Structures are given as C-alpha cells and as structure tokens.
Amino acid sequence: MSDECKWLNESVPSLESASDATVRGSAGKRAYEWIRDAILAGEFAEGEFVDEVVLAARVGTSRTPVREALQRLQVERYVDLVPRRGAQVRVVTAVEMREIYQARFVLESDALRTICTRRAGVPDAARELVLQMEQAGSARDWNRFAQLDQLFHSEIVRHQRNAVIADLYDSLQPRQVRLGTRTLTEAPARLLTIESEHRDLLAAIDNHDAEGSVDVLRRHLREIPELVNAFSR
C-alpha cells in the first residue's frame, strides 16, 4: 500500500470521530441548557430527584449527553449526584445566600474602588445591560434578568483590569444566576429597588465616587429578612 493510501485510511476514521464528537457535543450542550433552565424556572423543585431516562426523553437525546450534562451541573452546584439514587436538585440555603453575597461584596467593592481611583468611568456594555435588564423586568422574565444582572456586575469587575479577580468572580456565575432568579421569584417587588440601585451605582462610578459606589453596592447586597426566610436554613 502506498504512503498516500495509508494516509487516507488513517485520515477517514479521524474525520468520522470529529463528526461524532460534534454531534455528542451539541446534544450535551442542549441537554445541559434544558436541564439548567428547567431548574432555574422551578420545574424541578429543590431536593427533587431527577431521572436520567425521563430527562433524556424530554430533551430528545440518549442518556449519555444527559449524564454528561448532570456532571457539569454538579460542578456548577445545580445538582448533587447521590450514589445509587441519581441527581438531586440542590437546595439553596440562607447560609449559602449570605456567603455568595459576602464573596460578591469583597470582589465588587475592590473593583469599584479601583475603577473610581483610576477615573475609568462606566464600561459601555454595563449601560446597555441595564437597559436590557429593564426590558426583561418589564416582561417578568426573572431568569433572563438574573443572567443579565450577572453580566452587568461582571462587566464592572472586569473593568478594573485584573483577569484573576475577574475569573474568580465569574466562577460564582451559576449560583449567582440561580440565586437571582429565586430572589425575584420569591420577591418580585424587589425589581424596582434593584433597578434603582443599578442606576445609582452607574451615577457613582460616573462621578468617580469610590465610597459612594461601595455604599450603593452594600445596599444592593444587603440581607432582606423576608427574603432570607424564604430559603432553607
């Protein structure tokens, strides 16, 4: 067999493998997004066990992409994989809520002080995200609002130009979005307050007011007793 034929024979399987991987990847992505969005929408209650076979039928895939999706969702703390029982939707506790807010305050307040000290101003993307959030709020699309809210705060953190801190902040993204969705589902009246605080935050950054912006952030992330009571202890 010529070297050219050998090369062709070796190449064809690798192309097929790449194609198979693409199909598996797209199915896994679809399964991941479907299950994640169902959890965020409250279709699966906290503490509920979800069955791989049922999920595969609803997503329209085999069990393998569903299993891979659940493994990713475990890493992102949407579910816990319990031996011999399967995937259980994680319960968001009041303690976890406080810890997420505390972590956010540490990272975001540092970013605000840096941005204001450097007089860097508001990132353009943040202004656009505020407008998009107001549209999502008007539509009462809490999941969409929470996703945009995370992007808004992430843009501000990234604006201080510290890639390590930005990556640390974004590692909170899955829990931040889930918590935001749950917050507005439990207390939709908070929407107007949240939107007002976003505008106040932008104004403080525009004025290069470091401590003023941190004060707004502190109000924005403060504990609301009636909201904390909605979460498990």
Language-model segments: residues:
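Short linear motifs at protein or domain termini
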Residues: 1-117, 225, 229-233
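C-terminal all-alpha effector/ligand-binding and dimerization domain
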Residues: 2-11, 127-135, 139, 178-233
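Hydrophobic side-chain positions on well-ordered alpha-helices
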Residues: 38, 43, 136, 157, ...
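Charged, amphipathic alpha-helical coiled-coil/dimerization segments
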Residues: 81, 94-95, 124, 196, ...
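Hydrophobic packing residues in well-ordered alpha-helices of helical domains and bundles
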Residues: 100, 126, 145, 149, ...
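Hydrophobic, amphipathic alpha-helical faces that serve as interaction scaffolds
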Residues: 103-118, 150-188, 227
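Amphipathic alpha-helical dimerization/coiled-coil segments
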Residues: 108-135
